[in-house]
From Swiss-Prot:
This is Peptide deformylase. Its EC number is 3.5.1.88. The gene is def. It comes from Rhodopseudomonas palustris (strain BisB18). It catalyses: N-terminal N-formyl-L-methionyl-[peptide] + H2O = N-terminal L-methionyl-[peptide] + formate. CDD domains: Pep_deformylase (cd00487).
Amino acid sequence: MALREIIIIPDKQLRLISKPVETVSAEVRRLADDMFETMYEAPGIGLAAIQVAQPVRLITMDLVRKEGNSLTEPRAFINPEVISASEEMNVYEEGCLSIPEYYAEVERPKQVRIRYTDLDGNVKEEDADGLFATCIQHEIDHLNGVLFVDHISKLKRAMVMRKFEKAAKRGIKYV
């Protein structure tokens, strides 16, 4: 396992649409292991492969230590997709390892049904609610080039982007 560098806004790679994983290979499993190690070191509860500059549809997540979640163990999700969502919404304060030290309330569907492939190559469907639903939607957004700040007001988003663009120009790195 190896730590990987987490890319930070305004890095344009974060806006890429990640490509599907064709086969669950040793390379994909190694990437997942690296992502878990990187996520724990950061520390965070979820990480999309694009955040470590790998534009493939892979997410790692561990909500075990968080209250209000239905995910009971660390998990990797390959080619995840939301196949249905509740009309009822939930608001959670979200943060992101690619947008350090910034948090905002985001409204998302309270429950979602997801389809994904696990690290053994099995295609699964599962219901997610609470923090699990919020986190999986946040990470799937990353795979589609969408950041959580895209769900907040234009004014707040512009302020956040400006702050990170100025920091990048001055060579300030957030870690």
